[in-house]
Amino acid sequence: LTSPHPHVVTNCITDLSIHGEVFDMIGLSRTPYNKINIHIGGAYGDKESAMKRFCENFERLPDSVKSRLTVENDDKASMYSVKDLYYGVYKHIGIPIVFDYHHHKFCDGGLSEQEALEMAISSWPTDITPATHYSESRREEQEDMSIRVQAHSDYVLNKIETYGNTIDVMVEAKHKELAVKKYLELHG
């Protein structure tokens, strides 16, 4: 939705619309609880203009998508931090932000982890538990410097810091349910 190319935006709207239709067909309520989570897309050399295009193109989406859409912070410094999304998207169109702990390490927008988490939390409706994503670096887990630092690890070994907030945490790890099982064995 940030693209300056109309055909790219049209394709994105078509794809998101299909997601919204499927969610409707299986009876999921139209709230961010049943989220369609996306990264907002490229910055195209001008983040402010790209976020403005995102907000304008958001209005072209059907209600089945608009009511469920959430946005997530990126893992590259040149892309979108929680702070960018909060002021450039949420403040204009009210889309909740899914905080990704691992991505924040690479694109912090000048905020601490706690500040970014709590900013993202504040974007959610009060009757829905905010969603977050948590992963750890595969490079650090494997102690292999040839692995991209942003790559997800097999397991999540560190205790997830919620800073006293009530949040839903989606674990992103290569070993999926086994990773969650191991985390619960380690941290309860």
Task: Locate predicted features.
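Active-site acidic/histidine proton-transfer and metal-coordination neighborhood
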Residues: L1-P96
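Short acidic, Gly/Ser-rich segments with clustered Asp/Glu that frequently serve as metal-coordination loops
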Residues: A77, H102-D108
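Sequence-level detector for tyrosine residue identity
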Residues: Y33, Y44, Y80, Y86-Y90, ...
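Conserved, mostly hydrophobic/aromatic
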Residues: L69, D100, V169
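Histidine-acidic metal/acid-base catalytic patches
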Residues: I95, F106-G188
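Anionic group-transfer/hydrolysis microenvironments
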Residues: D74, H102, K174
